[in-house]
Amino acid sequence: MQKIKSLMTRQGLKSPQESLSDLGAIESLRVPGKEEFRELREQPSDPQAEQELINSIEQVYFSVDSFDIVKYELEKLPPVLNLQELEAYRDKLKQQQAAVSKKVADLILEKQPAYVKELERVTSLQTGLQLAAVICTNGRRHLNIAKEGFTQASLGLLANQRKRQLLIGLLKSLRTIKTLQRTDVRLSEMLEEEDYPGAIQLCLECQKAASTFKHYSCISELNSKLQDTLEQIEEQLDVALSKICKNFDINHYTKVQQAYRLLGKTQTAMDQLHMHFTQAIHNTVFQVVLGYVELCAGNTDTKFQKLQYKDLCTHVTPDSYIPCLADLCKALWEVMLSYYRTMEWHEKHDNEDTASASEGSNMIGTEETNFDRGYIKKKLEHGLTRIWQDVQLKVKTYLLGTDLSIFKYDDFIFVLDIISRLMQVGEEFCGSKSEVLQESIRKQSVNYFKNYHRTRLDELRMFLENETWELCPVKSNFSILQLHEFKFMEQSRSPSVSPSKQPVSTSSKTVTLFEQYCSGGNPFEIQANHKDEETEDVLASNGYESDEQEKSAYQEYDSDSDVPEELKRDYVDEQTGDGPVKSVSRETLKSRKKSDYSLNKVNAPILTNTTLNVIRLVGKYMQMMNILKPIAFDVIHFMSQLFDYYLYAIYTFFGRNDSLESTGLGLSSSRLRTTLNRIQESLIDLEVSADPTATLTAAEERKEKVPSPHLSHLVVLTSGDTLYGLAERVVATESLVFLAEQFEFLQPHLDAVMPAVKKPFLQQFYSQTVSTASELRKPIYWIVAGKALDYEQMLLLMANVKWDVKEIMSQHNIYVDALLKEFEQFNRRLNEVSKRVRIPLPVSNILWEHCIRLANRTIVEGYANVKKCSNEGRALMQLDFQQFLMKLEKLTDIRPIPDKEFVETYIKAYYLTENDMERWIKEHREYSTKQLTNLVNVCLGSHINKKARQKLLAAIDDIDRPKR
């Protein structure tokens, strides 16, 4: 394009812009005419040759418009000019020029219509511009006319109006500043009214207004004053926040939170709140303990105020220890309740804020609120554990500040109950197991309980040695749950029962302490005399609660209210001053013996005063175990020792007889023998009487053992009229069985608190010890059965009978009648004893079974003493035994008769042949060697020869050899 322009320039042509600027030159612009174009086009041409000419033109000719062609060509001339060469070169240039001109002419001719059209458009544009110039000229003329129309007065009026508006705005600003100057009075009033949100709102509005007028010099001082006021409000707000820690008030806390929200410091407020709670715990416990210490000191010495809390706790006296502990827990409860209600407040308002935020559209503000809410929630949840840890440490310090071993049992239980309640609070507060509290009191409890248990074992031994085994007259519907010591079991079944006697909730939902006492009250408001609010009603008014006629006849014995309280306490612990248990005095029992017991009460418990003491002790042990579950195993172990010692005492007093084991009747099972041996090895100190000068080391080794008890000399077991102390034996044995039944009843409760790793001990105790209590009946009542009948006299009568008769007798022998008379006398004596003591059916059956078994074995022994016997004599034996059975079945209801087959089989063995008898001897090893030998000797001569006799005796000797 530049080349074309250059060419046009050289030929005198102008661009369209130049044509517009000088319209006059348009006419003078020479454009090749059609004729010229036609001539150029009509000239014969070779396009290829023309193109080659154009291509042969040097590139420099097409470089820039400022290129000087003449100069370029002149500079190319050689130093020596040659005319022919110059002409040839000139002709070449002309040919090139002609080719270019023709090419340009072709291009111009081709673009001429567009060129003409563009010139027409330019002409039209020029006309429009001329019209616009006329319009502008008219506008300027009218503007000058309007300007000249306004006067100086009008402009002055407008200036005054503007000044008036400015002055009105200034007056308004001055009034606002005046109001701001007086807001400090209103702020003070609002702070006194504890209207913190209103005060902060007002202060912030004042600061905002002051920032609007910051261009006034007086505002800077006002800003400083408002900032000081705001800081003062924050200080008072912090004080108000601290009041929440001890006495939470919803309205008060709502105002405080609204105020902090206005300040945008909700997170800071939560941090401050936790600091205040920590400080409140410290100040509260210190003030409570300090108050009791100063009260007990009896002076106004201020030295205690300078002590550390740990040292201050060591100055609490034993008398004030429990009240101080209760008040300490009350105060700490108030702090934790305030924290609990604080969390409730935030949960409630979080839900409300979430609901309102879901309706709004400010996403940025909602995100900030959610962040603050999440921070506060995490802070509160973390604070639960932190606050409870502080509470535990404070109470632990208090617990360890005093030696609890000097406390009475009830006082110690009271302390444990308070701590247990506190641990329950901790579990509900933050789910903590209160390891700090548990560990701090566990060791003290174990040590205390070991000493207490040792004292109780010695006391139990004294009771057993002074026990006359008389009935303790309790009601027929007696239950251990009626005793004070087991009241806690009824309370524990209802989760809402508390020591402060709150009504039991009928709802099945468990109510927490915080829910129960949220509106008022305190779980540590325990009355010391709470246990005396109810009285026991377990003693029968007359024996076993006989009929109305008996009650009226012996009404003077219906109550023991006239018996001094001192007589009811057979033993007082010299160390603790604690009466062991509530028991009925022996004098009262003697007075009640005058009345007959109602023996029809098949369910009336048989127990003694000592049994009741043991049951009460078990109740106390379970109380401690229920309160302090970590020592459950130790307590249950000590409880098992109480039962072990009672069982061992009953066996020692009434069942120990070495001759029993020689009977071969298996009266004592292997389990019972194992249990007795275990008790003797682990619990009984057999050396205490044999070696009174034992060394200190030996004494320490036997510290956990108890001397074997001795039966009271008042208990007579040698009189035949009383069936050798049958009444005492029944009371003792059945009281043990009753005690075992109570342990069976308590097994689920013990199993529930026993640690899983220790449960095998409990299972073994029940399976090998408690369940063996009823097995003591056999050896104990066997001794009575062995003396109740005169078995030796029967053997003498049987020895006088002639058994080698030659004819069958129709009349039984006299020894049968004598034996039946012995049974009749035994039955009469048994009835006499049953008037004093109810004899349970199992006991009666065992007695009859033992007596019948002994009688039958005595009969076999009598038959084994016979030197000569005929077949008729054997028939007489059968007649005697059948007569005995017939009469005996009228005296007893026991079926089948014990050892009936034992006698019949022995009598029938007389008729066996040699081979049958040999087999019979090997199969019936229940007979003694003497009895088998006599059977063989008596048969000699009748149907057994001497050779067979020797063979049978050898078989008997083979059987007897392993027994030696």
Curated annotation (Swiss-Prot):
Residues 8-20 have a biased composition (Polar residues). InterPro entries: Syndetin_C, VPS50, VPS54_N. There is a cross-link at K963 (Glycyl lysine isopeptide (Lys-Gly) (interchain with G-Cter in SUMO2)). GO terms for molecular function: SNARE binding. GO terms for biological process: endocytic recycling; protein transport. The modification N-acetylmethionine is found at M1. Disulfide bonds: none annotated. Residues 1-25, 542-564 are annotated as: Disordered. There is a cross-link at K963 (Glycyl lysine isopeptide (Lys-Gly) (interchain with G-Cter in SUMO1)). The keyword Membrane applies. It is found in: Recycling endosome; Membrane. Residues 82-105, 216-244 form a coiled coil. Ubiquitous, with higher expression in brain and skeletal muscle. Keywords: Acetylation, Coiled coil, Endosome, Epilepsy, Intellectual disability, Intrahepatic cholestasis, Isopeptide bond, Membrane, Phosphoprotein, Protein transport, Transport, Ubl conjugation. The modification Phosphoserine is found at S15, S494, S498, S559, S561. One of its GO terms (cellular component) is extracellular exosome. Its main location: other. Component of the endosome-associated retrograde protein (EARP) complex, composed of VPS51, VPS52, VPS53 and VPS50/Syndetin. The EARP complex interacts with EIPR1. Interacts with VPS51 and VPS53 in an EIPR1-independent manner. Was named 'syndetin' after the Greek 'syndeo', which means 'connect' or 'tether'. It is linked to Neurodevelopmental disorder with microcephaly, seizures, and neonatal cholestasis: An autosomal recessive disorder with onset at birth, characterized by severe global developmental delay, profoundly impaired intellectual development, progressive microcephaly, seizures, and transient neonatal cholestasis. Brain imaging shows agenesis or hypoplasia of the corpus callosum. Death in early childhood may occur. Acts as a component of the EARP complex that is involved in endocytic recycling. The EARP complex associates with Rab4-positive endosomes and promotes recycling of internalized transferrin receptor (TFRC) to the plasma membrane. Within the EARP complex, required to tether the complex to recycling endosomes. Not involved in retrograde transport from early and late endosomes to the trans-Golgi network (TGN). Belongs to the syndetin family. This is Syndetin. The gene is VPS50.
